[in-house]
């Protein structure tokens, strides 16, 4: 599927559009979708205690559809959601070689989790997608809102595996009303999310669009390595299809490489407190009601998530010098208020806006009747889903652009083209800095003046990704490949690109400046899939509140928080209700950052659905099993050791003289008081060299402390003792660890 520009890693630009399709502007009649290639009928059954006890496997190469049983071992050790996905993928890949992302054996796995699909508990509508990433060549997971995972479960399946490569473009339809799975030829269906979802909802949903949820990507995923998955749901209040994204790691690129235009699930049944088959309905009602009342009372006083969503973070990050500006060179800018909560308070459509039924946090948000200024839909008024903080910071401030309408337009086209806004923003910012440093020029960029702040050029990059032409697909290869291309084609200095290229493990950084937080450097660098904040977000605890001054305290938090956050992905939950709204007396508790009152509530929630009583320690243990298994999975893929936990120096300290001097008082003070270095009569360059030495040494010490706390050896590999303790010492796991012992 990917064009030859990407396959060869060449900079040869296509002369014309690769994906030119008249159907972008002309409607496709739904009757063209009816040639069934494969079909599988099944009995519907009933969800019991959060499970169907079976998963669905679709082999596109052989057009074979099968059902697999879920055994008790799988539930006990992998719980559901991300855990199920990882276990299924682990067993699908060849044992005699390392599979690549575009090998037919690779899968796109999607699961919900036992708690997912509960309407009375906030944040219970998440799906988790897992695959081998085109960016990292290792396993990647992505947590996403919407109705798909819940509908998949209510249609009879705890997880979905899509394996193999179809010979022609296809649509997968899972009919949870009739108990039927079909693979159909896609014919002339467009790739663009907003077009294909509308067509498929009309075909399969008929007069009930709310019964349909669609997973799709877009043409940008066909021409880049960071294609996202769009998960749709129907907004009854606005009478429109809405979207959330499984953005990180390029799973959308994998889906399009398999020639899958869309996966559709249908469920027309009523969603009630009993639909998920809970073990204790009354406890579930009680714990859900308590949480919802707390959110309705306290959210207006705290972050106003139900009004401004995550946009409130822009002002906070800017205030604490944590907002990425100009490729993470700086942490604040006087123009940041033009991207902040008060701007989006006015722009967001009013009224309840949640991505799951019954979620009182309701933080989805979108912009109604936004008139597009560029691209194939110029002049059209559209509904834009978002933007959220990561998009605002990524395609906005990090590219030196402080224009809210521009960010909204970028958000829209990234969704339509199926592109991860975080990777788009961070990769574009890297290309901009390379351009300003003279490492590449206009000839390299096919005529684009790629300066920071040039919003027209940034938008054109995205349109080129959608069309598969120009410099856009080069940026779409991601920072790691761009560094290689710029060095080989243009003689760019590799050392400076290594320092300023904000990627680790091949994945672009999400949007927080980490220079002054050693713990967050570890949160990014030690994250399993690469530098994504959903695993460990410790900046405030470390930098602002100074609650972990020692390496041991940092290591403890870099153990506990990733473990607890992992638990959300095992169960089909959103993390935001846990700590974006907190009890009124939370500050008086022993460890307020952990919000133990809410964790105890999650334990009750787990019991109410599954019937299994658990403690906080049990929750951490559940996550530890899956977390360590994923680390070992990376080892199987040829990664997962100490060297792969490296991060670029800009994540650690100032790369340029300009960066140092923007915080000169802070850095001079640290050199003198923390490291005992005499700054008198020293040049900026000398001080930068000294600071780098000290900070890089600290990061290595942090690795040692975290590895020890997690039960890993000095090379970052889980020990045999650790996996035996976690009861994941499967024969192939033990054999793999012995090779790296």
For each of these PLM feature ranges, what is it?
Residues 5, 15-17:
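Polybasic, lysine-rich low-complexity intrinsically disordered segments
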Residues 25, 33-34, 359:
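Autoprocessing domains of the Hint superfamily
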Residues 20-21, 26:
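Intrinsically disordered, low-complexity proline-rich regions
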């Amino acid at each position: 599927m990917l064009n030859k520009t990407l396959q060869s890693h060449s900079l040869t630009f296509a002369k014309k559009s690769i994906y030119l399709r008249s159907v972008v502007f002309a409607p496709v009649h739904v009757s063209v979708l009816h040639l069934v290639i494969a079909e599988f009928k099944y009995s519907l059954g009933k969800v019991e205690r959060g499970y169907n006890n079976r998963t669905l496997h679709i082999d596109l190469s052989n057009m074979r559809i099968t059902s697999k049983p879920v055994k008790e071992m799988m539930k006990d050790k992998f719980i559901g959601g991300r855990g199920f996905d990882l276990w299924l993928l682990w067993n699908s890949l060849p044992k005699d070689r390392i599979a690549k992302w575009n090998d037919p054996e690779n899968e796109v796995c999607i699961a919900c989790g036992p708690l997912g699909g509960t309407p009375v508990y906030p944040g219970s509508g998440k799906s988790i997608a897992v695959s081998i990433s085109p960016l990292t060549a290792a396993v990647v997971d992505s947590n996403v809102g919407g109705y798909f995972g819940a509908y998949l479960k209510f249609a009879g399946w705890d997880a979905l595996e899509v394996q193999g490569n179809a010979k022609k473009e296809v649509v997968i339809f899972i009919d949870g009303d009739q108990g039927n799975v079909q693979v159909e030829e896609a014919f002339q269906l467009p790739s663009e999310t907003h077009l294909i979802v509308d067509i498929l909802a009309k075909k399969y949903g008929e007069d009930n669009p709310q019964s349909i949820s669609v997973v799709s990507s877009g043409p940008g995923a066909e021409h880049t390595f960071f294609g996202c998955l769009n998960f749709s749901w129907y907004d009854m209040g606005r009478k429109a299809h809405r979207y959330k994204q499984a953005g990180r790691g390029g799973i959308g690129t994998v889906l399009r490489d398999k020639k899958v235009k869309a996966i559709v699930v249908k469920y027309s049944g009523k969603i009630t407190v009993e639909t998920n088959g809970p073990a204790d309905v009354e406890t579930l009602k009680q714990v859900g009601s308590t949480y919802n009342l707390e959110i309705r009372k306290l959210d207006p006083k705290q972050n106003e998530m139900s009004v401004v969503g995550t946009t409130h973070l822009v002002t906070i990050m800017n205030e604490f010098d944590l907002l990425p500006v100009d490729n993470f060179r700086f942490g604040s800018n006087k123009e940041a208020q033009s991207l902040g909560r008060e701007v989006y308070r006015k722009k967001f459509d009013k009224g309840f806006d949640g991505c799951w039924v019954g979620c009182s946090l309701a933080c989805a948000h979108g912009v109604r009747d936004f008139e597009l200024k560029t691209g194939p839909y110029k002049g059209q008024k559209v509904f834009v889903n978002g933007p959220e903080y990561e998009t605002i910071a990524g395609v906005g401030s990090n590219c030196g652009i402080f224009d809210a309408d521009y960010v909204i337009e970028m958000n829209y086209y990234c969704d339509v083209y199926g592109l991860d806004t975080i990777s788009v923003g961070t990769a574009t910012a890297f290309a901009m800095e390379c351009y300003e440093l003279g490492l590449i020029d206009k000839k390299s960029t096919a005529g684009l003046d790629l300066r920071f702040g040039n919003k027209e050029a940034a938008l054109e990059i995205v349109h080129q990704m959608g069309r598969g032409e120009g410099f856009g697909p080069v940026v779409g290869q991601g920072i790691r490949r761009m560094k290689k291309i710029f060095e080989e084609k243009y003689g760019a200095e590799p050392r400076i690109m290594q320092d300023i290229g904000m990627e680790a493990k091949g994945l672009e950084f999400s949007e927080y400046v980490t220079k002054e937080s050693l713990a967050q450097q570890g949160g990014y660098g030690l994250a399993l899939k690469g530098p994504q904040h959903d695993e460990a977000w410790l900046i405030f605890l470390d930098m602002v509140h100074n609650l972990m001054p020692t390496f041991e305290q940092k290591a403890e938090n870099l153990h506990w928080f990733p473990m607890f956050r992992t638990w959300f992905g095992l169960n089909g939950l959103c993390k935001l209700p846990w700590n974006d709204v907190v009890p009124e007396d939370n500050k008086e508790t022993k460890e307020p950052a952990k919000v133990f009152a809410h964790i105890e509530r999650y334990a009750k929630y787990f019991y109410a659905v599954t019937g299994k009583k658990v403690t906080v320690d049990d929750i951490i243990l559940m996550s530890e099993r899956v977390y360590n298994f994923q680390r070992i999975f990376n080892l199987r893929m040829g990664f997962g050791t100490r060297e792969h936990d490296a991060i670029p120096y800009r994540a650690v300290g100032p790369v340029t003289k300009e960066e140092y001097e923007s915080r000169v008082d802070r850095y001079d003070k640290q050199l003198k008081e923390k490291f005992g270095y005499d700054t008198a009569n020293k040049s900026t360059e000398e001080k930068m060299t000294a600071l780098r030495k000290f900070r890089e040494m600290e990061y290595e010490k942090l690795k040692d402390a975290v590895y020890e706390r997690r039960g890993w050896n000095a090379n970052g590999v889980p020990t045999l003792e650790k996996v035996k303790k976690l009861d994941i010492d499967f024969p192939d796991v033990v054999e793999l660890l012995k090779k790296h012992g």
